[in-house]
Amino acid sequence: MVHMLGGNLLLAGIVIKLSQGQTVIESLTGQADAAYWLILAGVAVNAAIPPFNAWIADAYPESTMGGTVYMGSFTTKVGVFCLIKLFAGTELLLYFGVFMAVWGVCMALIENDFRRLFAYHIISQVGYMIASLAIGGEIGIDGASAHAFNNILYKGTLLMCAGTVIAATGKRKISQLSGLAKKLPITASCFLIASMAIAGFPLLNGFVSKSLIMNAAAESGFYWAELLLMIASVGTLMSVTLKVNYFVFWGKSTEDIEACEKDVPLSRKAAMILGALACIITGLFPDLIYSLTPYGTDGHPFTVDHVTQYIQLFAAAAIAFVMYIDHMKPKEKITLDTDWFYRKPLKYTVLCLSKGIDYVRRKAGDSLGVFFERVNEYLHEPRLLITDKPPKSRDCLEDDDVLQKPVGWLIALSFILFAAIVVFILVKI
């Protein structure tokens, strides 16, 4: 339904442009008219831009394991690609992108459901891409493109590892899992590498693409955006790299959880290992990614200042995690998303509208009932058309004088009208 809404909004905007005789892509967003906003809204729905972001956390976790990997890795990237082609350099999107990056990690920090947690990180990572393309310029667009590519690698690996854990244990709540590194060592190792990559650890691919985004924000003067995106990186570290690794894989093992690496299909193991290796290789050799970007930006992520800055931030975050580890433990509770802001009032709005429509329907039905009842009376008793007093009985119609006066007036009116016509004709002659 959400994609249908986005597709129809996009189609409506394109139809308006076509009716104006404009078929070039650049003309689709040339001016901020109705078509511009329809196209932007249509793409925003598919890219999970607020307030159209809650559907990801509701839909993705309920799909199949393989479906989640494909959708989490590719679906929202199509929306990002459209935004790069149509709305690159639109400053309005910068605010939405930064909000998505921060909001996603905040929700992931308190989320207990394994799959919903990664759904929120999809929103957060897409926020980085949208913020980068909104900054525009060669570095901004290349940063968004590189991060989209890298996101496919580490996000796909993370989702495969999560699916392996759920398939092996039959549980998807983090609070129900612990110490799986001994039982699923390959899965745990691949997850650790991918979780460090998504946080932006140096020497991994997430670091090289985030470096472009941060440089684009700094060079464009958006220092506030750079700061908030750095905070989002720290939140990613705490919610995935530390929280999930500790409570699911490397914490105290419990004997009541049955899981065995031998039960994991060989094809899935190979896919996880290849994904983890890809995160390492593209992180050690960033030119492999930079050369594929639209402008081929020559980035230099491994400067001493840049690497030191990330290490200091992550070290401080790790210390804070250890200090508040009891508060970081996931709890069994419902996570309220942004959709609750409009679901509650929308419920009462629909209820009030339904009552209003039902009232109009009942009144219209009653009025139609009275109307047809009167019509039925007139059809059975045509004399009611010339008098409001129906005869007392059909036997006394000839003796009752109730109809005499109206009939006499009609005859008199007929004679007067006839006389007027005759006089008019004689005068004309």
State the predicted function of each range.
Residues 198-201, 280-287, 323, 421-429:
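Alpha-helical transmembrane segments of multi-pass membrane proteins
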Residues 1-263, 284:
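Hydrophobic transmembrane alpha-helices and their helix-loop junctions in integral membrane proteins
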Residues 262-316:
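Hard-cation-handling environments
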Residues 155, 235-239, 316-333:
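Hydrophobic alpha-helical membrane-embedded segments
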Residues 48-54, 173, 203-204, 208-210, ...:
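Juxtamembrane/interfacial segments flanking transmembrane helices
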Residues 40-43, 226-234, 303-322:
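Hydrophobic alpha-helical transmembrane segments
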Residues 291, 295-304, 326-429:
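Aromatic-capped, Gly/Pro-kinked transmembrane alpha-helices
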Residues 11-14, 102, 274-281, 312-324, ...:
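Hydrophobic core of alpha-helical transmembrane segments in multi-pass integral membrane proteins
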